[in-house]
């Protein structure tokens, strides 16, 4: 009986979106309280179909200027590749050991602080990133957008928030946070979900 009222007693009554970085692409899980808004088995890669630049790149199966075509690791790497070198982008080149396939949003922002050639790409990426976040923010009436798995530092967060505030105001900017859930909770979160859903809500094992 300890968990009968788990949802009422422990879940915060707010909508949130968990946006996470997964091997070079984006995934999103909208949540209301402590429960996912979308049904189990829904495609969490829907976020990659969001348009962040109507005049942007085309990719088969996606709208013009989609997240996939503009913000994926492969897409951003394509913008950097023409000048990626030990001479022009020394910080990024060293961080990635000369391998652009290892690019992440965090490594781009960190390197752009010293590699001046990267700054236009970094600025454009942040702006388009904020368009994606704002779409999710409005679509799900989210009180928070949690960024998970990106490797962002608090300084990176402030950089993103500054661009977000210029784009859509301070309230939106402050809704963007670094997800407090650490990697050690991956297994525990799964156990919690199974116990809550399978036993407390359904009265037995999940089918």
Which residues are covered by each model-predicted region?
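Phosphate-binding/catalytic loop of phosphoryl-transfer enzymes
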Residues: 1-66, 73-74, 195, 200-206
């Amino acid at each position: 009986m300890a968990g009968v009222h788990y949802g009422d007693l422990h879940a915060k009554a707010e909508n949130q979106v968990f946006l996470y970085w997964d091997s070079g692409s984006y995934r999103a899980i909208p949540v209301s309280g402590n429960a996912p808004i979308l049904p189990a088995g829904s495609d969490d890669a829907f976020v990659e179909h969001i348009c962040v630049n109507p005049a942007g790149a085309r990719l088969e199966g996606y709208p013009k200027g989609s997240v996939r075509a503009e913000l994926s690791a492969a897409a951003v790497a394509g913008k950097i590749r023409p000048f990626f070198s030990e001479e022009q982008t020394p910080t990024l080149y060293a961080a990635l050991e000369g391998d652009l396939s290892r690019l992440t949003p965090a490594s781009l922002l960190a390197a752009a602080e010293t590699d001046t050639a990267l700054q236009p790409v970094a600025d454009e990426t942040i702006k388009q990133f904020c368009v994606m976040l704002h779409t999710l923010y409005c679509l799900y009436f989210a009180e928070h957008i949690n960024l998970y798995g990106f490797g962002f530092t608090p300084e990176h967060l402030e950089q993103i928030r500054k661009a977000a505030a210029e784009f859509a105001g301070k309230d939106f900017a402050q809704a963007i946070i670094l997800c407090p859930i650490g990697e050690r909770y991956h297994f525990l979160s799964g156990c919690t979900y199974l116990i809550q859903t399978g036993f407390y809500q359904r009265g037995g094992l999940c089918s």
